């Protein structure tokens, strides 16, 4: 449930409003959406499901949200945030059959020195999130634009 909430908060609230306090940020999102209509809720559910499907289509159910540049078997919160945030901005048609190029770009991103530095300390710091998004989005735009 918290991961779903994280997806919505990071997609619909300004990252600049995030003060490195995840609980407060998620609470603020919940408060601002406590009166959503059933139609709005259905739309949000659809967005989440479609975005997750795009991630799984590209990386596979067993590999999605795992750092493919390492041998770690666990899914990573920072990759969940990064991929769900970025894939929500593109349609299935834009992603198309570019899975191999996207996987290669993610591997390059995960090996990037700046990206690796953004993972030191608390992974979900605003500065780290911004750094990772910038590095990843530069590579993804080349493929999907």
Model-found features: residue ranges?
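Flexible coil/loop and intrinsically disordered segments
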Residues: 1-145
């Amino acid at each position: 449930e918290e991961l779903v909430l994280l997806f919505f908060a990071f997609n619909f609230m300004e990252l600049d409003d995030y003060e490195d306090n995840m609980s407060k940020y998620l609470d603020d999102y919940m408060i601002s959406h406590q009166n959503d209509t059933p139609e709005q809720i259905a739309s949000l559910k659809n967005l989440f499901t479609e975005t997750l499907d795009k991630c799984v289509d590209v990386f596979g159910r067993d590999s999605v949200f795992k750092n493919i540049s390492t041998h770690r078997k666990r899914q990573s919160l920072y990759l969940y945030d990064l991929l769900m945030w970025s894939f929500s901005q593109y349609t299935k048609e834009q992603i198309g059959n570019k899975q191999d190029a996207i996987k290669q770009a993610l591997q390059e991103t995960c090996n990037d020195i700046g990206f690796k530095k953004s993972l030191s300390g608390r992974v979900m710091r605003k500065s780290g999130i911004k750094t990772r998004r910038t590095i990843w989005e530069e590579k993804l735009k080349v493929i999907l634009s």
